[in-house]
């Protein structure tokens, strides 16, 4: 690898010599006779054109000679001086400036040094003469020519920073810059990829890849060093010689590797990210919601243990046994699960006839007879005891829901809920439909048993009604927040539910034939009339009223589903802990992890950057308006917002552009960074402060 670097240096050193030789008055011809300079020039120009075509193609190159960068390194800058003020000073004293970058520390504070790039070599030399020892806010500036970036590199090494460019050797000769960029894009955002070529425009088997961040360059070394590309092992290391534009990190960049640390291995989190153990058990408010947030598995945790369906919403009926010892639901779960499984197996084997082909379901009747007696009565008592606790908790829940301003952000995550689970639901319900056609005869026997049990539930339900009266005021206070949830859930329907619901249509028709066999006679035998008006009137439903229920709307299902598991435990007497963390919600932890992680695999833990949709553009022409900025960046994608930063009614030469998605913002950075507008090369990057 050292030989490859030295060879690259030799090419860079020999190219100027070739130009000097070509500029000599006479050049020897093939037969040894001197040829006048004028006759040789067309041949040299043709060769250069062919060479440029082979090397660059249509790629944009901001510098006429990419091997030369006219930089000046300035130190002893007052710490309160901004890059714009420094640029104005250099422009006033020297002339046109291409690029200015203040070097910052990990906290975003100036280190008192900067890199200034010029378009012409004369400007670089003039800056070293004119600005050196120039007094700025009482401090004499120190200016040095730095065309190879050596002074800036030393300053960055002192700051413990790494470059973002890697050097790749032992490449196959047919690998071009596009293939190199395609491969290394797996490690991060590639700003530029280059293949070093010889004087004939052929690959030398070495190249460089520049990433957006240094950590991506380190990751590329970990991922690709020693890996085969076209049967040749790549040798990847940090490029110590290159310092391309963009290696000077602005304050919004995250902290880089500590000084002296050469690299890091893979963490235990997703994508090799390190895990913060402090956030693993940080569930919020509604039970087992996963680390520091509420993902799809979290919000469906109570629902998916009841459905008997596969996929993210599935998981069988095993969790019904956790509804409290006083409810005897574990026995119901065992009988129903076993019977449904046997019925599904028989249906797949092609058995016909409801009574003869599903003997397990027919045997459910006597079992439910035994369950529905004492078991149902104990269920009512358990409900009465648990609902006393739930009532007070829901009143506290109302206070919490008033603070849930971030619920409006749930829409983007809920849009991802559709495709995540409904396709799995459709296939599972399709199998349930075949089984439901054979359940009818067994359900007839269930009716008699359940009727006896429900008759004995009337008295406990009276006690439940007294508790539900207390829920009315709490539910009314939940109304405004859940109304915002309803608006967000409207966005869920067209996004992901369409395909799943289309598949569910014919399946539901098949389920209907089985449900019809339950009939009115069976329902009449269930003893529901014993619940009567007296019990229902005591439930305080009039307190909930039309206004609250209309605002709650279709959002009640998903909103309450997330808490079903914890509510089940609360009914057994442990519900008091469900909302003991209201202080954390009030301080903002609830909004960030709840709304920000809907539909994902957990929320954004503190310290993990959220992808931004806004970019920051610098070095704009001062006559550039927000309309011109918006029109220009519309080439990359739909622009939601564009603005030029102003001071005293005049442009500061920088602005922001907001896109509809982080992907479009990243594409705009790749496309527009380094582009020239009115002779000024703009600098485009993600606005981390947005």
Curated annotation (Swiss-Prot):
What is the reported tissue distribution?
Answer: Expressed in all tissues tested, including liver, heart, lung, skeletal muscle, kidney, stomach, large intestine, small intestine, pancreas, spleen, peritoneal macrophage and thyroid.
| Modified residue annotations for N-acetylalanine | 2
Q: What is this protein called?
A: Heterogeneous nuclear ribonucleoprotein M
Q: Which gene encodes it?
A: Hnrnpm
**Residue ranges constituting the RRM domain according to the UniProt record:** 70-148, 164-241, 613-689
Question: Region (27 X 6 AA repeats of [GEVSTPAN]-[ILMV]-[DE]-[RH]-[MLVI]-[GAV]) spans which residues?
Answer: 360-568
Q: Which GO terms describe its molecular function?
A: calcium-dependent protein binding; mRNA binding; protein antigen binding; protein domain specific binding; RNA binding
Phosphothreonine found at? 625
């Amino acid at each position: 690898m050292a030989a490859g670097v030295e060879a690259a240096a030799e090419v860079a050193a020999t190219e100027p010599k070739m130009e000097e030789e070509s500029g000599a008055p006479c050049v020897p011809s093939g037969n040894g006779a001197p040829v006048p300079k004028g006759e040789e020039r067309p041949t040299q120009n043709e060769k250069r054109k062919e060479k440029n075509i082979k090397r660059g193609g249509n790629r944009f190159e901001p510098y006429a000679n990419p091997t030369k960068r006219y930089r000046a390194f300035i130190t002893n800058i007052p710490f309160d001086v901004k890059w714009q003020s420094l640029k104005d000073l250099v422009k006033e004293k020297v002339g046109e400036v291409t690029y200015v970058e203040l070097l910052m520390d990990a906290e975003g504070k100036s280190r008192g040094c900067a890199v200034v790039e010029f378009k012409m070599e004369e400007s670089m030399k003039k800056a070293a003469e004119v600005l050196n020892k120039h007094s700025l806010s009482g401090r004499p500036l120190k200016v040095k020519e730095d065309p190879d970036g050596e002074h800036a590199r030393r300053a960055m090494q002192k700051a413990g920073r790494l470059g973002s460019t890697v050097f790749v050797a032992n490449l196959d000769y047919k690998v071009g810059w596009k293939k190199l960029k395609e491969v290394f894009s797996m490690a991060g955002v590639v700003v530029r990829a280059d293949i070093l070529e010889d004087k004939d425009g052929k690959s030398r088997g070495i190249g460089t890849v520049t990433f957006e961040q240094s950590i991506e360059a380190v990751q590329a070394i970990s991922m690709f060093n020693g890996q085969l590309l076209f049967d040749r092992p790549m040798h990847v290391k940090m490029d110590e010689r290159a310092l391309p534009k963009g290696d000077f990190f602005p304050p919004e960049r995250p902290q880089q590797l500590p000084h002296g640390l050469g690299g890091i291995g893979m963490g235990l989190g997703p994508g090799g990210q390190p895990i913060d153990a402090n956030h693993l058990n940080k569930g919020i408010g509604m039970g087992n919601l996963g680390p520091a947030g509420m993902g799809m598995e979290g919000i469906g945790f109570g629902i998916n243990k009841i459905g008997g369906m596969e996929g993210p919403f599935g998981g069988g009926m095993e969790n019904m046994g956790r509804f409290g010892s006083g409810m005897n639901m574990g026995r119901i779960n065992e009988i129903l699960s076993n019977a449904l499984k046997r019925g599904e197996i028989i249906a797949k084997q092609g058995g016909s006839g409801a009574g003869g082909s599903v003997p397990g379901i027919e045997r459910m009747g006597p079992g439910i007879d035994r369950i529905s007696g004492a078991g149902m009565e104990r269920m009512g008592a358990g409900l009465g005891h648990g609902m006393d606790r739930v009532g007070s908790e829901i009143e506290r829940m109302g206070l919490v829901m008033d603070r849930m301003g971030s619920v409006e952000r749930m829409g983007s995550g809920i849009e991802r809920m559709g495709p995540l689970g409904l396709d799995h639901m459709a296939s599972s319900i399709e199998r349930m439909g075949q089984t439901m056609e054979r359940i009818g005869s067994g359900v007839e026997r269930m009716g008699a048993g359940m009727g006896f049990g429900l008759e004995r539930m009337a008295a406990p339900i009276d006690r439940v009604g007294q508790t539900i009266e207390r829920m009315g005021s709490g539910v009314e206070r939940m109304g405004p927040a859940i109304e915002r949830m309803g608006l967000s859930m409207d966005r869920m329907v067209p996004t992901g539910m369409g395909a799943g619901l289309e598949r569910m249509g014919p399946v539901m028709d098949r389920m209907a034939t089985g449900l019809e066999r339950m009939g009115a006679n069976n329902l009449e035998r269930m003893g529901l009339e014993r619940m009567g008006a007296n019990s229902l009137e005591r439930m305080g439903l009039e307190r909930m009223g039309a206004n609250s229920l209309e605002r709650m709307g279709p959002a009640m299902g998903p909103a309450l589903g997330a808490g079903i598991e914890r509510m089940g435990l609360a009914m057994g007497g442990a519900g008091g802990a469900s909302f003991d963390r209201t202080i954390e919600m009030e301080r903002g932890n609830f909004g960030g992890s709840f709304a920000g992680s809907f539909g994902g695999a957990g929320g954004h833990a503190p310290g993990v950057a959220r992808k931004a949709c806004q970019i920051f553009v610098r070095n704009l022409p001062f006559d550039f308006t927000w309309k011109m900025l918006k029109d220009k960046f519309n080439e990359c994608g739909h622009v939601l917002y564009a603005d030029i930063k102003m001071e005293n009614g005049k442009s500061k030469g920088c602005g922001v552009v907001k896109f509809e998605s982080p992907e479009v913002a990243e594409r705009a950075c790749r496309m527009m960074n380094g582009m020239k507008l009115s002779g000024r090369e703009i600098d485009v990057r993600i606005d981390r402060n947005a």
